[in-house]
Amino acid sequence: MKNRYIQQFEDAQLKDKTMPAFKAGDTLRLGITIKEGEKTRTQYFEGVCIAIRGNGVDKTFCVRKIGANNIGVEKIFPFYSESLASVEVLRVGRVRRAKLYYLRDRRGKAARIKEVRH
């Protein structure tokens, strides 16, 4: 059980930022703010959300993409991170699992996720 002051602080933190609704299997495009010395720039990272864990301020999600030379790159982001400039849902995937860790072992067409058609 959390202290009520900590709970009030966390609730205030959650109100400040809104995120689009997404789940595991969705393809996301994340804008990450990178600060280099005096300059700031936005770098985009596009991949499939393979896991969402935690709740409240401690909530995180993991995004996986296949980079250069077919090397898998996974990044874990705090849900309410200040470095996330933007989050876009590009495609909504249809999966039957909450954690898609099995995609790590798959290559090529086997790693595809069906898209939800509206």
UniProtKB/Swiss-Prot annotation:
The family annotation for this protein states:
Belongs to the bacterial ribosomal protein bL19 family.
Protein's name according to its UniProt entry: Large ribosomal subunit protein bL19
Taxonomic lineage is: Bacteria, Pseudomonadati, Campylobacterota, Epsilonproteobacteria, Campylobacterales
Q: State the InterPro entries in the record.
A: Ribosomal_bL19 (IPR001857), Ribosomal_bL19_CS (IPR018257), Ribosomal_bL19_sf (IPR038657), Translation_prot_SH3-like_sf (IPR008991)
Record function comment: This protein is located at the 30S-50S ribosomal subunit interface and may play a role in the structure and function of the aminoacyl-tRNA binding site.
State the species of origin. Answer: Helicobacter pylori (strain ATCC 700392 / 26695)
Signal peptide position in this chain? none
| A GO CC annotation given for this chain | cytosolic large ribosomal subunit
Q: Which HAMAP family match?
A: Ribosomal_bL19
A family per Pfam: Ribosomal_L19
Report whether Ribosomal protein shows up as a keyword of the record.
yes
Origin, by domain of life?
Answer: Bacteria
Checking NCBIfam families in the record gives: rplS_bact
